[in-house]
Amino acid sequence: MIKKIAVLTSGGDAPGMNAAIRGVVRSALAEGLEVFGIYDGYQGLYNNKIKQLNRYSVSDVINRGGTFLGSARFPEFKDPNIRAKCAEILRSHGIDALVVIGGDGSYMGAKLLTEEHSFPCVGLPGTIDNDVAGTDYTIGYQTALQTAVDAIDRLRDTSSSHQRISIVEIMGRHCSDLTISAGIAGGCEYIVASEIEFNREELIQQIERSIIRGKRHAIIAITELLTDVHSLAKEIEARVGHETRATVLGHIQRGGSPCAFDRILASRMGAYAVDLLLQGKGGYCVGIQNEQLVHHDIIDAINNMQRVFKADWLKVAKRLE
């Protein structure tokens, strides 16, 4: 029977992480467990940055963006000797189990601790990219989506005033959920997803045809890493004769107070993680599917479950262009 658990946040921050930490801490305390916070992710674990938390440690954090525990990327965790030391540090504090909040890289760390050192870990999906398998939504995605839509709305105001074409680069790495959803909600004329081969010439020809039909401005939503959006803007302007500007939303998408959906999702997932650990279930990750909380083997989430590309959503977006 576990008596002490720890929680850490790892990788890129996401709105709602604080709500998830709060969900873990208060649920665990309600079950009579002691809770420890690990500061700065796996790097902080390696450096023994561990502090006991109480219910007041998570007061007034549910509405705050980021993560008060801090986060850091720690590639050294790939070293089995580093992982062995981390497991030793956890046990030196009497900690019996660990909740890890982050993306697929964070899950891998939890998987290895569970496999190599029989240390029970549960993963919560915390990333704005919505690219974690085994869940319909990740913590932070809905807030980042609203941030992107707000930016698109503002760009449309100025683009329509100046007959300008605006390119908006949206985060997501190799998952275009944010781009497609923001593109539909923002009424973007063109959506360029990473899951489909990008054809610059085809895009420019589409814009040219729109201008011939009398289109005075346009918004192009494009997933990051596909192309240099500033060079694309110059090429479009040279070809179609309309002023074209590129806006990279960047890390602004990660910040801000989490929306109600993310606060509730994170709170529920945090409590569910504690329930799993109390049942002796380590090596799992939590998700939400069809409005129900679920858990999967963390190895499956990393290796076997493929994210479903929103091809039908993109088809709808194309019809609305």
Swiss-Prot record:
A biological process term (GO) from this entry: canonical glycolysis
A GO CC term assigned to this protein in UniProt: 6-phosphofructokinase complex
Modulation of this protein's activity: Allosterically activated by ADP and other diphosphonucleosides, and allosterically inhibited by phosphoenolpyruvate.
Residue numbers binding ATP: 12, 73-74, 103-106
GO molecular function annotation: 6-phosphofructokinase activity; AMP binding; ATP binding; fructose-6-phosphate binding; identical protein binding; metal ion binding; monosaccharide binding
Family named by the database record: Belongs to the phosphofructokinase type A (PFKA) family. ATP-dependent PFK group I subfamily. Prokaryotic clade 'B1' sub-subfamily.
Protein name, UniProt field: ATP-dependent 6-phosphofructokinase
